[in-house]
Regions:
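Short beta-strand micro-motifs enriched in acidic
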Residues: 46-48, 105, 254
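N-terminal short leaders/motifs
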Residues: 1-7, 37, 46-48, 84-98, ...
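An N-terminal domain-cap segment
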Residues: 1-69
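Short, structured beta-strand-loop surface elements
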Residues: 51, 59-129, 137, 143-144, ...
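A structural signal for short, well-ordered beta-strand segments and their strand-loop junctions
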Residues: 28-31, 79, 146-150
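Short, surface-exposed beta-edge/turn micro-motifs
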Residues: 24-27, 50-52, 73-75, 143-146, ...
């Protein structure tokens, strides 16, 4: 195997920020200026093609988001958390945070707003989920409200570190990725299937891939490495999937001494979640022979 070029880490961070704002993960809104101590309201969310974020919620009576009138902008904080689909252990893959203005839409204007909205990411008409459908369902339910959040920047915390991005940069990510297909939104079922495909490669294959990335023999990069202080011994000698998308897989390799998180990049952007298994199996088949040949 020959050395490979390290991919653009900032581009991957922007793709992750777009995924989170476009509908992935769980989102919560806080009207921090009205009552900072009030609990956040969990919302369904989706980013429109113009960069504004649609949110739908059923805020409890008496809370700031319930009493805020329609048509009046309210300063809010939006927090989105994406957890790994790893059973038995909670791993936070990424979080996004932004400050913006939320305006609740009057009842008669909701249908028009939803009908004229287009999601920022494509979705598969067969198995993919349109995040706007979830927003529409919550907004039309008992006590449901529909609003639009306008913002300029988003702060992202992910395995590659902390970064800040303009909304315009996130919207332009497809044009920045030369030759890449438009962003595809995978359904929760597809994401779960992709995680299972990563696990199916097996611990030996995943460890070989991790070693090859660390040694610069497979595309990717090491995000962090820290002592395994406080890690449950039952997790030692395991490699777990933190996240997976069309561009690569984020793995966490745990030993009794250290915890290493790294990104494995695919040679080409995948057309669908069903290609994750074959793509990672191919990388493992490249890395395994050299690992097994070592004394």
């Amino acid at each position: 195997m020959t050395s490979v070029q390290v991919p653009d880490i900032m581009q991957r961070a922007r793709r992750m920020a777009r995924r989170l704002l476009a509908g992935s993960g769980s989102a919560a809104v806080t009207a921090y200026r009205i009552d900072p101590s009030a609990p956040a309201a969990f919302v369904a969310h989706a980013m429109r093609a113009d960069g504004r974020i649609l949110v739908a919620a059923c805020p409890p009576e008496g809370t700031p988001l319930a009493t805020a009138p329609d048509g009046v902008a309210v300063d809010v904080r939006l927090d989105v958390t994406l957890d790994a689909a790893e059973p038995g252990v909670r791993i936070t893959a990424a979080t996004a945070h932004l400050l913006g203005s939320l305006t609740w839409i009057e009842g008669e204007d909701r249908s028009l707003t939803l009908a004229s909205s287009r999601a920022s990411a494509c979705h598969c008409a067969i198995v993919g989920e349109d995040p706007l459908e979830r927003v529409r369902e919550i907004a039309s339910g008992p006590g449901g409200r529909l609003g639009i959040i306008t913002c300029e920047r988003v702060m992202l915390h992910c395995v590659s570190g902390v970064s800040s991005h303009d909304i315009e940069e996130i919207l332009d990510i497809d044009s920045a990725d030369a030759g890449a297909a438009p962003s595809i939104s995978w359904s929760p079922q597809e994401i779960m299937g992709a995680h299972e495909a990563v696990s199916a490669v097996g611990q030996l294959g995943l460890r070989a891939v991790c070693e090859a990335v660390r040694e610069g023999q497979l595309p990717g990069w090491v995000c962090s490495s820290r002592p395994a202080v406080g890690v449950c011994p039952t997790l030692w000698d395991r490699t777990m999937c933190v996240d997976v998308d069309a561009h690569g897989v984020t793995l966490m390799s745990i030993t009794g001494e250290e915890v290493t998180t790294l990104v494995v990049s695919f040679a080409q952007v995948l057309a669908g979640a069903g290609e994750v298994g074959p793509a990672l199996e191919q990388l493992a088949s490249q890395a395994l022979p050299q690992r097994l040949a070592r004394p």
